[in-house]
């Protein structure tokens, strides 16, 4: 078994080194860097420094029980082996291993918990200590369009570094639930010109200060030329909950929903908000009389819009067992109702 693992690591590292050499060669030509990512030569020094500081904390995640080996990235958030990655990296896998930077050993990893509403997953490797870590940006709301960001991949990819810009915020993308393998839309991601492949997905999206502002990810079936990132503003609470308790619990209406942009809502003669798709009759929404088709426009005094989607508001500004006022639209009329929020693992429906 040790021999097999050794051969596997050797083969994977060899492939990663080859890829890393090719990417390094392309990065040493400033014109190629500019053409690919739009990052100017004056920013190269900052990008290089960020990558050098981040690489020791970036890992490769290998999934073993698919038709072929799957490879992605992640990064350490604690010195004893907790790793943040994207749900797409581990979707459908029951056996995962992790390769640390500067290590030749594959460490068995387990999925601690995940949230397919935000797209984040947390893994754990055991019998490790004093590992380097990366920190979340202290003010993720400071992220703006046009800001320089850097994606760093794991050691199997030669620590691939891809710089780029934040091209848009609050973009919807589709990901896969790692347990049920169903797809779900995430409504608040970062779009970047940095090219993100399947092997760098799950790695950190960093600002020029070397702080994590997102988690790199691929969108299923996307035709966009760049990549996407899970916004740290949305995943921080999840990660903290998982580290503290081993699982994620968020406030819930007991209903599934789809967000309506201002443009989409206008086409249907509806207000901007979140339209209920299914309602559990025994849950808070059902007990309060809400029905499928109702459009939630406000929770308490917070309006539902592209920057404040319903699911993220429920997790960020409210808590289970809290009594709130819900404003909703039905048949041309706006109505308010009071209900008490439930607590549950984030729904992936």
Question: What do the predicted segments below correspond to?
Answer:
Residues 17-82, 86-88, 94-95, 119-120, ...:
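N-terminal activation segment of mature serine protease catalytic domains
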Residues 31, 45-50, 208, 212-267, ...:
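C-terminal cap/linker of serine protease catalytic domains
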Residues 58-62, 84-87, 143-155, 190-195, ...:
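Active-site-proximal beta-strands of protease catalytic cores
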Residues 92-111, 130, 142-150, 158-177, ...:
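Beta-strand/loop subdomains of soluble extracytoplasmic proteins
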Residues 25, 186-191, 195-196, 243-313, ...:
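PDZ/PDZ-like groove recognition
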Residues 1-27:
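Hydrophobic single-pass membrane-targeting/anchoring helices
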């Amino acid at each position: 078994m040790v021999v097999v693992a050794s051969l596997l690591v050797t083969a994977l590292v060899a492939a990663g080194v080859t890829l890393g050499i090719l990417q390094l060669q392309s990065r040493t030509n400033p014109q190629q860097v500019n053409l690919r990512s739009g990052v100017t030569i004056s920013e190269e020094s900052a990008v290089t420094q960020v990558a050098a500081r981040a690489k020791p904390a970036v890992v490769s995640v290998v999934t073993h029980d698919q038709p072929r080996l799957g490879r992605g990235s992640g990064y350490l958030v604690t010195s004893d082996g907790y790793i943040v990655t994207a749900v797409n990296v581990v979707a459908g896998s029951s056996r995962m291993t992790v390769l640390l930077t500067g290590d030749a050993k594959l460490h068995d990893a387990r999925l601690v918990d995940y949230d397919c509403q935000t797209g984040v997953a947390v893994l754990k490797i055991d019998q490790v200590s004093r590992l380097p870590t990366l920190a979340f940006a202290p003010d993720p709301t400071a992220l703006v369009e046009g800001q320089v960001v850097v994606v760093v991949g794991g050691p199997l990819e030669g620590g691939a570094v891809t710089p780029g810009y934040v091209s848009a915020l609050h973009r919807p993308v589709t990901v896969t639930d790692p347990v049920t393998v169903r797809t779900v839309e995430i409504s608040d991601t970062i779009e970047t010109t940095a090219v993100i492949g399947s092997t760098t997905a799950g790695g950190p999206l960093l600002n020029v200060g070397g702080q994590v502002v997102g988690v790199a990810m691929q969108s299923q079936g996307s035709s966009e030329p760049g990549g996407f990132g899970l916004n740290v503003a949305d995943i921080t609470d999840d990660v903290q909950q998982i580290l503290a308790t081993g699982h994620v619990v968020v406030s819930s209406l007991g209903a599934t929903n789809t967000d309506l942009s201002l443009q989409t809502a206008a086409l249907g003669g509806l207000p901007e908000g979140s339209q209920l798709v299914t309602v559990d009759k025994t849950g808070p929404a059902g007990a309060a009389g809400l029905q499928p088709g109702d459009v939630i426009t406000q929770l308490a005094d917070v309006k539902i819009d592209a920057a404040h989607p319903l699911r993220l508001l429920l997790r960020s500004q409210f808590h289970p067992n809290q009594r709130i006022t819900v404003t909703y639209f039905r048949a041309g009329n706006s109505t308010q109702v009071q209900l008490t929020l439930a607590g549950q693992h984030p729904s992936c429906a």
